[in-house]
Amino acid sequence: MRYCLKSRQKKELLAEADEIRVAARDYRQAVDLMEEYPAARIIVDIDDLDIKWSILQALNEKYPGRLTLCLAVGDVLEEFKNFEYFFSFYLNTWQDLNSAVSLGVNEGFIGAPLFFQQDKIKERYPNFKVRAIPNRAATGNVARADFAHGTWIRPEDTEFYEPYVSCFEFASPSAEIEETVYKIYKRREWRGNINVLIPQLDYNTNNQFIAKEIMPTRLNCNQTCETRNSCHLCDTALKWQATIEEYRRQKEEKRTVKSTSMVTD
């Protein structure tokens, strides 16, 4: 698995990164990053066209194959055509993916329900590089009834996604949180509450007790929990473990109350 970190991260971590993502406002920073991290691919966010294109064009010519643009706009304009690029928004349907590929895009973020058809994506577009944000359960403007049906990936499940997903990057409000989440996913193990790692899930569940065997099912399940209201393997697994955790908590509280009462008596 490849890992992408934001350019404002610590230098020692950027030295480990396979890819470094530069915010649009910091696009000039790409010049130094190319030289400081020669093994890394540099991805520059493009939110609008108010930048000095000659800088990026010069970098693209000097370091062929190392500069990629991440476009927040869906229209492919003349300025983009000499660069490798993908879109910052999710491709959720076959129409989204087909349209992107027809524009020359060969990688991108895949959202639901397409996320749950990894084998079909690989079969139809074997050279398309799927990107994922594993600690984000879902995106979009519509409220979700249950984020368990979303596109989250646990650290332990990385091995199942490696044949399909090329790169992980992380949803993180700060460099410190990104560092922590990155290290957990690179270690491929998390022994704490899954809600701490993937906040949208909102399940008080100890991650290490979630059955690993059920997770490969998510790869190609077609999200039947939503399309046919069937399966519900993911939310059942999370709720079951959360119920066990609550039972243990209540049992421990009763034990504590009883011990305190005995001491008082």
Features from the language model and the residues they span:
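Active-site pocket-lining/capping segments in soluble small-molecule metabolic enzymes
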Residues: M1-D96, L103-D265
